[in-house]
Each structure stands twice: as C-alpha cells, then as structure tokens.
C-alpha cells in the first residue's frame, strides 16, 4: 500500500509549494490595480447632495526613476450627441493642474479651506474631464529628485505612456472624441503631446489592434507659443492699456529692455529658444516701473495690484484656500495619494521649473501648422486684461503663421476672416475669428485665467468648439450669439438628459466592463486553478484515507487540514472580488441620468457620487523666472 503513496517529504514539499504559489498569485492580483482602486468614495467639504462620479490617483510612467503622474477624472454628467473626453493641463512649467480643477473648469470651487461649492460653469456637463499633474514632480506627481525632465519631447513621451496605462484602467473612454485644453505654458505642452499622439496612431500595431486615439482638437487659453512675437508684445500692450505713457521717463527703461531683446532675437537667427533670459527683463522692467509704495501691477490681470515683488503671485483670491485644502490628510486619502509622495502639495514646483528649460525643443508655434493641416482643430482664446501672455502677442503670431495654403486668417489672398461679435445672455462678451481649422476668441474684461472670471462663458465656448448639440435632448439653451446668430443649441446651467445617446453609452460601458473583468480575471484564474489542483490532490488523498487505515498515520502533518479549508479560502477571495466588482460597478456603471427624478433648474443628478514643508529640492533649486511662488518677481506662465 505504501508504494502507491507519495513519500512524506514530497507531501510536505507540495504543501509548501502550493502555499507559495497561492501567496504569489494573490499578491499579483492585489497589486494589479483596477478602476475600483481609484474610485473616490467621498470628498471632504463636498456640497450637500450625492458625490460626483470621479477617480483619482497615481499612474507610473517611469519605473526606473519612480516617476508617477497624478490624475483626477470626473465623469460627464450628460451625454449630448457623442461621447467626449477633455484633458486639462496647467503650465508653469511645474504648476499643478489642480489650479484648473479647483479654480477654473472643474465641478467644484473652494468657499474656504474646508468647504466646496459647485461651479455652475464646469466643463464636465457634456464631456469627461481629466486633470493631470505633469511633468513628474508637479503638484501631487512625483519622481526621484535627480530625474526631472528637461525637454518637451521627453514630457510628451511620458504623457503618452500615462495615457496608455490610463486607458488600460478605463477602456470605456479609449474611443471617445479626445480634446486637450489648458492655459499658459500648456501652449508648449499640448502641441507636443498632440504630435506624439498622431505619431503613435501611425504605428502598425496600434492600427491592427484598432486602438487609435481620436484626437479632435486643442483648446488653449492665454498660451505661450512663440517667444519672438510674445516677448515683443509687452511694450505695445502697456502702451495700449495706458499703463505707461510713450516717451515718458518710465517708458525709457522698458524700451531699453525691449531693444536688448530685439538684438538677442536677431543674434539667434531663427534658432530662438522657448525661454530667453534677456527678453524676460522686459516684463521685469514693467513690474518695476509699476511699483508704487510697495504695490505693483498684477501681471495676470492689469486691472488689479499686488504687493511688490509678487505682482500677481497671490492671485486669484481662491489660491489662499487651495494649498491648505489639498494638504489635508483626509483629502490626500480620498484622492489616493501614494505614500511615496513625501511632501505636501505645492502650486508650482521650483525644482521642476529649474530643470525644465528646453534647449533642444523648438517653440510649439512651429508645430501648429502641421497639426492644423492634419485635421486637428485648434482653438486659441485670450483674456484681454492679461499681461504675461497677452492677446497682442497671440494675435501677432497667428497673423504670421502659414498653413493650408494661406496666412493667418486669410480666406483668400488679401481677404481676411471678419471678427464676429459675441454676446452672452445679452452682454457683450468678446469676438470670434475663424479660418481653416483655427478659431480665435477674445474675452473682453478677462484675465490670464479666463474660466476663473467667466466660467459659464468659457463653457459656452467649449461647447461650441466641441460641437455639442442638445437639439435632440431638450433643456433650455443659453442665449449665446455670434453676430446675432445663435448657432447650435448648447446649455449652461440647465442639465438636460439624453435618451438614445445615453442608452448607446450604457451598452458601451457594459461591454468595456466585461472586458475589464476578463482582464482582471486572468490573474484570479491562476489562483482558482491552483486552489482546484490542491483540492483535487487532497480529495484523492482523502479517498486513499478511507481505503487504507495507515494513510493518516503515514502523513500526520495533514491531520489538521479539513476538507472545507480550501473552499473557505477560495470563498474569501471570491468575496473580495465581488466587493471590488461592486465598487467598479458603482463607479463606472450606475445609470447616468434619471428623467423621472429630475427637478427643474440646475441639477447634479449624475453625482454618484499635509502640512507644507520646504523640500531639499526647493532649497537647491530656488524659484526662477517661470515659477509661481509668493514673494518672487517671477513670470510664471501657469
């Protein structure tokens, strides 16, 4: 009888190996994150009512250097004629996109450092919103301190990696119409990312797998694109705004700095860098001249003043609440901030800005013609009261740019597209100008951060740019007119519901969810197979036990293992999987809208809703011209 039984040492070894395999498989399953791991279940200070559907956390983009980008995603509240995702980036370089999320286009605004309120002009009405802190080291993102990026193509490569891994987690969004939006130095980031996406889409493997990303448009406000035209716009802008009188003693210092910049740009002979130290002195001279009794002009809104030398760094007023809120332990826990993030959130990272000084990258203005000709629509908008990235410089570089057989806003040789007056709810709002895939919008009486000043107008601009049409949905369209014409119906502040489009989206989400379950189930299957094999082995031994009285005596080490132990273990695994699936379903598959329960007026029915410390980086890398730090006379293009 003993010849039919495995030797005692083999039995012991099998048990140990089974244990090791189960532990390893369990660890792999636990470490492979899914969408449910990023689901935001509560948000401190949230307004009354159910929470918005959102996900947040880190995604690794550079394993070697521990590079992780932070994202915060808000699901759209309603679906109009098609599904869209807008990715928002702030600038700096090194300034957090939480500025955009909490002070501009996100669904929440801060009342104080512990209370949130709804933003009635939030961009998540008809589009999914994805905010990303990048490059690594910015905001909640992090990396080893010696691995910050230097060039725009490096940044774009990181971002494409981020998107690949984000879509693996959220496959239901991969085939959305994709738009990028942002402001200031994002005028450099976004065109480079767009080019990297178009290059990726040419990859044969991507084409074969039908994983093309449907990049439709770029929407950039008060962007930094072309140093030549934009540096040289400072002097004419201050003259136009009456900030300095021509030929005055105050003007002479600014004019000297302007002349030095012209000479430096001439010496570059077409090889102009994105950042030119000599030309930065023009803005510094303007701020110095404006200094009166310790107060200077706000470079982001020339109607305002600030203490010298901050000159706008303390603006907007919501900023004083932002850092205290985002450093709270309960907030970082809610947003799934990794423990590897050792320091508190800062608006702009001096170390990132000091490192990110592109020497090889050409200005993004050189990329725009190719993007336009490829079919990507581009919208540029300016707040008329911004100095640092003012509208004169933007308009000048547009007028010189050539693409699709024309120059600037030419409709035909010598015939330019007209500037069309825009009114919003009966008030003059600005003007539109369009030609050959490019749209330009000037917002009257607006600052560097247009959505902060006019959230609902900015959302109206977004809906027009995205081509949102609520004709088949219902709701009360906003009274927004260009040259007196209303155009496509869009809605701001009233939240209609989709029927057919919503049903199609539910089917899409259901298919994507089964795909996600299958993917995560591959790892779980390993655990089940191993457990089943172990159960079969012990079942065989139990039968031998019943057939021969010497079985238990020969293998006393197995006496404590009952027939129900492995099933109980497997059931514990299954219960955790069911809980994760329920969380995934709660975050991804809840009904988007409820027609019966909708109340009139603005609704939120689709809501399913650290202490700061000076780092060694900040000591070694003091704030520079591009950094937005209190108490510095810097020129941060946030």
Swiss-Prot record:
Disulphide bonds in the chain: none
Active site: 184, 386, 448
Gene Ontology CC terms: membrane; trans-Golgi network
Membrane side Lumenal: residue ranges: 33-519
InterPro entries: AB_hydrolase_fold, Peptidase_S10
Signal peptide: 1-32
UniProtKB keywords: Apoptosis, Carboxypeptidase, Glycoprotein, Golgi apparatus, Hydrolase, Membrane, Protease, Signal, Transmembrane, Transmembrane helix
Annotated PANTHER family: PHEROMONE-PROCESSING CARBOXYPEPTIDASE KEX1 (PTHR11802:SF190), SERINE PROTEASE FAMILY S10 SERINE CARBOXYPEPTIDASE (PTHR11802)
Name by which UniProt lists this protein: Pheromone-processing carboxypeptidase KEX1
Organism: Uncinocarpus reesii (strain UAMH 1704)
């Amino acid at each position: 009888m003993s010849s039919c039984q495995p030797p005692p040492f083999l039995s012991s070894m099998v048990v140990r190996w089974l244990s090791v395999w189960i532990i390893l498989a369990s660890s792999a399953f636990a470490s492979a994150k899914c969408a449910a791991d990023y689901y935001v279940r509560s948000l401190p200070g949230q307004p009354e009512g159910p929470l918005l559907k959102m996900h947040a956390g880190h995604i690794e983009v550079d394993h070697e250097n521990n590079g992780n980008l932070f994202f915060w995603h808000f699901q759209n509240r309603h679906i109009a004629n098609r599904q869209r995702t807008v990715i928002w980036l702030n600038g700096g370089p090194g300034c957090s996109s939480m500025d955009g999320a909490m002070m501009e286009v996100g669904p929440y605004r801060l009342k104080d450092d512990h209370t949130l309120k709804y933003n009635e002009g939030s961009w998540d009405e008809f589009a999914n919103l994805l905010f990303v802190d990048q490059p690594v080291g910015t905001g909640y993102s992090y990396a080893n301190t010696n691995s910050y990026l230097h060039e725009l193509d490096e940044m774009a490569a990181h971002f494409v990696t981020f998107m690949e891994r984000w879509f693996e987690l959220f496959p239901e969004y991969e085939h959305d119409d994709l738009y990028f939006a942002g402001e200031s130095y994002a005028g450099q980031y976004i065109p480079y990312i767009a080019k990297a996406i178009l290059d990726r889409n040419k990859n044969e493997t991507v084409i074969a797998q039908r994983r093309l990303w449907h990049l439709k448009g770029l929407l950039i406000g008060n962007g930094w694109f072309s140093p030549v035209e934009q540096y040289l716009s400072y002097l004419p802008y201050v003259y136009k705004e009456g900030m300095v009188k021509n030929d005055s003693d105050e003007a002479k210092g600014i004019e000297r700095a302007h002349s030095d910049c012209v000479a430096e740009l001439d010496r570059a002979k077409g090889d102009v860098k994105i950042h030119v130290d000599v030309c930065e002195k023009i803005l510094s001279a303007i701020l110095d001249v404006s200094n009166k009794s310790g107060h200077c002009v706000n470079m982001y809104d020339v109607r305002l003043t600030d203490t010298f030398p901050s000159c706008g760094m303390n603006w907007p007023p919501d900023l004083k609440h932002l850092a205290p809120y985002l450093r709270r332990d309960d907030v970082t826990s809610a947003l799934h901030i990794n423990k590897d993030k050792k320091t508190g959130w800062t608006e702009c990272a001096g170390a990132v800005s000091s490192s990110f000084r592109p020497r090889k990258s050409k200005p993004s203005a050189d990329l725009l013609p190719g993007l336009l000709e490829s079919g990507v629509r581009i919208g540029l908008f300016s707040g008329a009261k911004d100095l640092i990235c003012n509208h004169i410089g933007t308009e000048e570089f547009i007028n010189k740019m050539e693409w699709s057989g024309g120059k600037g806003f030419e409709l035909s040789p010598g015939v330019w597209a007209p500037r069309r007056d825009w009114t919003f709810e009966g008030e003059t709002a600005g003007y539109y100008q369009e030609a050959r895939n490019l749209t330009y919008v000037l917002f009257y009486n607006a600052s560097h951060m247009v959505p902060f000043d006019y959230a609902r107008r900015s959302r109206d601009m977004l809906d027009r740019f995205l081509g949102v049409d609520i004709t088949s949905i219902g709701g009360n369209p906003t009274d927004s007119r260009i040259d007196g014409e209303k155009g496509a119906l869009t809605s701001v502040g009233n939240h209609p519901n989709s029927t057919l489009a919503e049903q199609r989206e539910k089917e899409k989400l259901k298919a994507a969810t089964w795909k996600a379950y299958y993917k995560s189930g591959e790892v779980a299957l390993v655990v089940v197979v191993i457990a089943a094999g172990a159960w079969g082995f012990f079942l065989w031994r139990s039968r031998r036990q019943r057939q021969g009285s010497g079985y238990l005596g020969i293998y006393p080490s197995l006496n404590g293992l009952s027939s129900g132990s492995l099933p109980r273990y497997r059931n514990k695994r299954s219960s955790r999987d069911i809980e994760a699936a329920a969380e995934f379903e709660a975050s991804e598959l809840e009904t988007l809208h409820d027609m019966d329960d909708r109340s009139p007026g603005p609704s939120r029915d689709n809501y399913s809703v650290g202490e700061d410390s000076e780092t060694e980086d900040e000591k070694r890398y003091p704030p520079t011209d591009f950094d937005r730090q209190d108490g510095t006379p810097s020129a941060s293009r946030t």
